[in-house]
Curated annotation (Swiss-Prot):
Domains: entry comment: The HXXXXD motif is essential for acyltransferase activity and may constitute the binding site for the phosphate moiety of the glycerol-3-phosphate.
GO BP of this protein: CDP-diacylglycerol biosynthetic process; fatty acid metabolic process
Record's bilayer topology term: Peripheral membrane protein
EC number: 2.3.1.15
Family designation: Belongs to the GPAT/DAPAT family.
Keywords linked to the UniProt accession: Acyltransferase, Cell inner membrane, Cell membrane, Lipid biosynthesis, Lipid metabolism, Membrane, Phospholipid biosynthesis, Phospholipid metabolism, Transferase
Name of the encoding gene: plsB
Keyword Cell membrane attached: yes
Primary location recorded for the protein, binned into one broad class: membrane
Originating organism: Aeromonas hydrophila subsp. hydrophila (strain ATCC 7966 / DSM 30187 / BCRC 13018 / CCUG 14551 / JCM 1027 / KCTC 2358 / NCIMB 9240 / NCTC 8049)
Protein name: Glycerol-3-phosphate acyltransferase
InterPro entries: GPAT/DHAPAT, GPAT/DHAPAT_C, GPAT/DHAPAT_LPLAT, GPAT_PlsB, Plipid/glycerol_acylTrfase
Subcellular location(s) per record: Cell inner membrane
Amino acid sequence: MSLGQNISRAILQWPVSGLVNHKSLPENPITELKLDPARPIVYALKTSSITDLMTLQQCCEDLGLPGPFTPLELNGQLLPRYVCLDRPPPLFGKRSKPLPFLQEFHQLLDLHKQDPALDIQVVPVTLFWGRAPGREGEEASGWNIISSLAPNRLKKALIVILKGRENLVRFSPPLSLRHMADKHGTDEAIAHKLARVARTHFSRQQLAATGPKLPNRNLLFKQLLDSNVIQQAIEEEAQREGISLEKAQKRAHGYMDEIASDFSYRLIRLGESFLGWLWNKLYRGLSVNGAEKVRQLAQEGHEIVYVPCHRSHMDYLLLSYVIYHQGMVPPHIAAGINLNFWPAGPIFRHGGAFFIRRTFKGNPLYSTVFREYLNLLFAKGYSVEFFTEGGRSRTGRLLPPKTGMLAMTLQAMMRGLDRPVTLVPVYLGYEHVMEVNTYHNELKGSRKEKESFLQVLGILRKLRNYGRGFVNFGEPLTLNNYLNEHVPSWKEHIGEEERPEWMAPTVNQLAELLMTRINGAAAVNGLTLSALALLAAERHALTRDELQAQLNTYLDLLKQVPYSPHSTIPDEDAKTLLDQAMELNKFEVSEDKLGQIVSLDRYQAILLTYYRNNILHLFAMPSLVAALIERCEGISRSEIVARCIDIYPLLKTELFLRYEEDELPELVDALLAELQRQQLIEARDGGFWVNPVNQTRLLLLAESIQETLQRYAIVLTRVLAQPRIEAEQLEADGLMMAERLGTLHGINAPEFFDQKLFSTLIHTLRSEGYLDPGCKPDLGRFQALADNIVPLLSTKIRRTIQAGNRL
């Protein structure tokens, strides 16, 4: 380090430490980027800046990494631990000679030629001092200090003063110089290539972190009104409604004003501070997984479309906060028009929300304006977010997808976007959903409460510790790749006004796949596991030891037979998870001489079905296998596989399960092996039997799927009893029988009486060929499926269903 740098560091030490508050991404680069502290590390930065280097030094010290000022000695040579591509521009006069970064890269590569064991990790680091992207229509100015990408020393000093508290240090995955040297050599041309790659990388990092300039609403409205598509729609509206062109244009402008967001970076910054406080007050923390792959896609220039599940109004705030906190650009969010009330509407709008009506039916001008607005967002490169379920789930299960926004996304892509479009499924989970009581009332038949300021105040008044929140980014789905594989001719239809025939079925398939990938990113926690166990128990009560043992059973199943590489399982043991769940005060706990008993009263049991349903899909197949063994002792492996294959299509559609049919034999084998390892079952005489020592644990596992199988049995036996029944009547009779079962046998799960589930089941029976389009049944297949499902129910449930079918 030069004498000048030492003097600068000494002078700036106190100002920088007082003004700069850095945040690193990822939070643990050693683990998340697989950095090897035992191998030499050299940092690559875009611009030589003493404040950047000092900030990086402090950040590295906090993370346990060698800092840029830490000496690096290799083969007896003392080398700088950082390489910078550019000097800052001078205050006056011409730019001084360039930095010797090519020689430095070449020197590092040449060391690998001399020492075959050497492997230097080059870690690109980007420092952001604020992430305001600017706004369209703003004039570029030399005095625009904050947005300057190459500030001189005076500007940099002002940036540190004004934006030091917003500093973000972004570490990128390391580049192995050993790999580079072995594959490409060590001559000067490779050093040039390395420098070019680094420049491209830093440019993409800047765009991924700040995004394109924010839209200017007035300019945006003018662009929309000047478009040929909207001009034509205005003319058609005037003719259809018998009004003047001026009035029709004013109506179109009103729709734009109703729809369009008014993104404010200042609000995003204030929101980050407020929401950081809110999460600490509301929750014990946030768990975020899978963000790195999304950052990588953004950096590669993908159009990112976030597709989260919808649990709560809190989802809007949570996901935008997490995306910004993870160093990415908050998206424009499609929000229901019901949220456009004061003061939430203006706040959401400044936070990126654009508002959508429940239906476009009967209003072609509104439909055209909305579609063109969405097309413009994509064309300008803004990320977008929409909830494909269309509304919040009242039961904790994923709802059947609404395909409108997905279809419009695909149509926008077919307008000829010049970059890949990637859909990112997002699983949002909570240990407490603040609207869950309201959901229960709505499912009982109460009218949905209209969103209002008073409702917001009511929620804020109840703020308390709600446990943890979970945001898991699932497996991304790049539309271009999907269409290349499934619709090879799709590019031939780019720019066409008419929708191609393949559009509708492709959108439906994409929607199903997205829902499956959302469920594949599920987050397991102590509350959801405890709810699963207690709701499976007789009278919803277990001793604490039994409950803890059951949590162990669930955890071992998830670890030994993972549902998906994107789902997350807690690191804590069963005891710790149970302690955390009990702190949420959702259970009754009593104690006698033998120990604690954990139970649920009737109301708690109903509310906890919501949390159980968040993870029910993870245990659907383990529960089915357990039920087959528990009800059909001595059953063979081949019979288990055959029955699972027979029942699976119904479960797959209802719970958005990820397995294909040809994967089921291998899955069944893995589950049988794990159940034997846990000593829940025994294999003998060519079959599988319940291990009486651990019968309770197997019974609890088997019980989780019972309510689902009961619904299937209701419909199957009803069709067998009345083969000529119409679809609507079958749905109504199924719902009536479910309510009867609930009354007689104390089944309180709200989704047990959910008409949508009966509708989904009948649709699946049609698509699988059990029913023809006119609802005429294939009685042979119905009987075979009923023979596989009905014996898995308890005797009392079977009798009630049989009695109902005789009425």
